């Protein structure tokens, strides 16, 4: 790599969705390629096809390369990976589009693991069309969990709200069985750790949502709050995690109580994402607690508007900004903790790090 700017790997996503449209619109602004070195994994042919369908994107000019090591400063670099010919059927879920998305993802993750890129930003995929004998994952998060180190947590981020999820892509009927006191305590510990290292929050305050309506109404609507969630919050607090709750989700968001906390832990997918997307439509999906940084825009393939020049690129921009910020915060955190200053315990009235001064014994003249 020819410069020291952060190398942002970006995957093309589903080629029949809005992935390429938001990528092209993002990098039509030349300032984006000045703040980082973008390395896009996908098909240059598909990129050209979508560019020709869009207006006001003359600034998008790409540099074709064979490997990330060839990426040039100030250029929008594209690595041609995946099938040489990808049939484009705008707005449709096809196996070909799914295969192209997976090929780009695998190539980018390989480079991420080998240090060829610094962070990863993924355009949306269709989880169903991405399935194959070689790819049996229900989403990016599950695939990254298998490829990278750490226990990932799906986390939605914006300037006003951060939401971590206890459970991700499982049926609602299985959520109650998937949570336990121990798992919630561990999730709170991981959430605290990522808020400290990745968001530079010294002592984050975390709100924990209830599972049942009205936080169970004292056990009338479910006992998970009494038997699992509240004990977990108490134990986490004893372990120096500033956790509070459980709070009934509807009132918590409707009242604006979320503004008092640095993050929220939701028990299941829609409990966290529905209010988040309402409050922060241009938010970012961050895979927390992994060894590498990965973000994505907070939207799906959007087949209904694909190819119509209607997609808003702001969430993609925010995903790139977030990846860069998190990478920098994590690097500073590592530097601060690499050689901490030696700490001495003080007893009241004296410094035990200093030897007591002994006066010479008095002698008679």
Ranges and model annotations:
Residues 1-139, 182-267, 271-285, 289-301, ...:
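Contiguous, glycine/small-aliphatic-enriched amphipathic segments in soluble metabolic enzymes
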Residues 156-186:
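Ligand-binding beta-strand-loop-alpha-helix segment within the catalytic cores
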Residues 81-82, 150, 157-158:
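Flexible glycine-/small-residue-enriched beta->alpha junction loops
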Residues 143, 154, 163-165, 294:
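Conserved hydrophobic/aromatic beta-strand scaffold that supports enzyme active sites
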Residues 152-155, 196-198:
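A generic local secondary-structure boundary/capping motif
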Residues 131-154:
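Glycine/threonine-rich beta-strand-loop-alpha-helix active-site module
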């Amino acid at each position: 790599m020819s410069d020291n700017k952060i190398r942002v790997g970006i995957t093309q996503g589903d080629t029949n969705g809005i992935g390429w449209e938001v990528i092209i619109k993002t990098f039509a602004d030349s300032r984006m390629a000045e703040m980082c070195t973008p390395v896009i994994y996908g098909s240059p042919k598909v990129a050209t096809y979508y560019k020709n369908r869009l207006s006001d994107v003359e600034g998008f000019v790409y540099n074709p390369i064979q490997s990330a090591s060839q990426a040039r400063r100030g250029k929008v670099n594209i690595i041609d990976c995946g099938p040489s010919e990808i049939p484009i059927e705008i707005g449709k879920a096809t196996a070909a589009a799914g295969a192209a998305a997976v090929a780009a993802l695998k190539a980018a993750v390989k480079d991420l693991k080998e240090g060829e890129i610094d962070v990863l930003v993924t355009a949306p995929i269709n989880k169903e069309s991405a399935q194959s004998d070689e790819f049996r994952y229900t989403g990016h998060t599950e695939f990254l969990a298998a490829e990278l180190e750490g226990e990932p947590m799906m986390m939605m981020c914006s300037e006003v709200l951060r939401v971590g999820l206890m459970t991700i892509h499982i049926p609602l009927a299985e959520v109650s069985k998937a949570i336990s006191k121990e798992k919630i305590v561990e999730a709170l510990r991981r959430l605290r750790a990522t808020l400290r290292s990745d968001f530079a929050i010294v002592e984050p305050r975390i709100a924990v949502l209830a599972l049942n309506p009205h936080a169970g109404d004292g056990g009338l609507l479910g006992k998970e709050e009494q038997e699992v969630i509240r004990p977990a919050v108490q134990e986490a607090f004893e372990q120096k995690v500033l956790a509070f709750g459980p709070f009934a989700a509807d009132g918590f968001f409707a009242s604006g109580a979320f503004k008092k906390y640095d993050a929220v832990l939701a028990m299941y997918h829609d409990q966290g994402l529905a209010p988040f997307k309402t409050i922060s439509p241009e938010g970012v999906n961050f895979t927390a607690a992994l060894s590498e940084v990965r973000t994505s825009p907070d939207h799906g393939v959007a087949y209904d508007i694909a190819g119509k020049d209607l997609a808003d690129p702001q969430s993609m921009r925010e995903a790139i900004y977030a990846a860069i910020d998190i990478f920098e915060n994590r690097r500073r955190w590592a530097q601060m903790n690499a050689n901490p200053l030696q700490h001495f315990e003080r007893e009241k009235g004296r410094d035990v790090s200093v030897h007591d001064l002994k006066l010479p014994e008095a002698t008679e003249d």
